[in-house]
Amino acid sequence: MSIESSSSESSPNADALHLNSSEVRVLGCLIEKQATNPETYPLTLNALVLACNQKTSRDPVMSLTPGQVGQSLRALEGRGLTRLVMGSRADRWEHRVDKAVELVPAQVILTGLLLLRGPQTVSELLTRSHRMHDFEDSEQLIHQLERLIARGLAMLAPRQSGQREDRYTHLLGDPDDLQELLAARQHAPERNAANPAASQRFDELEARVAALEERLARLE
């Protein structure tokens, strides 16, 4: 299945959102930190660089420079997806995805997770979203994913060889980058297929490590 032909409904918003990998990472981080660390949001450039380069809760792990992050912010600002907030001590950045693309909070959170971690199963999204949005159950989460798909902002990814569960991915990035991610996942082990409980514990521990990394970064 072609990524570009996956949506049954054309979305003018989606057509304008062909982001490069750095822009995808920056936008995903702003969405995540608004939900998990509202006391430090909007983010300074330095805080955003740290968020982009986290070793946990990121796939792939990246090493972006302040210059790359700043350039991505300005490009996103030009699309109406970010905004600079002037401050007395430091300038900060916030995302505008909810307004620019007209998404409800649940859809914003799911979009952020897909931007940060690529193709994911419903169970993975349910576990990883628990600190950011209270989905009642998997059916409610699937309903919001289907609304994103109808807008041309996400898709049900083709199931790869050896995978038992369907995966969803965003459609905001470059189609070639998304195809590359899907190809890489074809050779990756399906972690939660054999032991879902262990997979959930792993994701919870990963979230705790990410929170500790953020605290340490603020102390430095």
From Swiss-Prot:
Pfam families: DUF480 (PF04337). InterPro entries: DUF480, WH-like_DNA-bd_sf, WH_DNA-bd_sf. Coiled coil: none annotated. PANTHER family: UPF0502 PROTEIN YCEH. It comes from the Bacteria. This is UPF0502 protein PSPPH_2577. Belongs to the UPF0502 family. It comes from Pseudomonas savastanoi pv. phaseolicola (strain 1448A / Race 6).
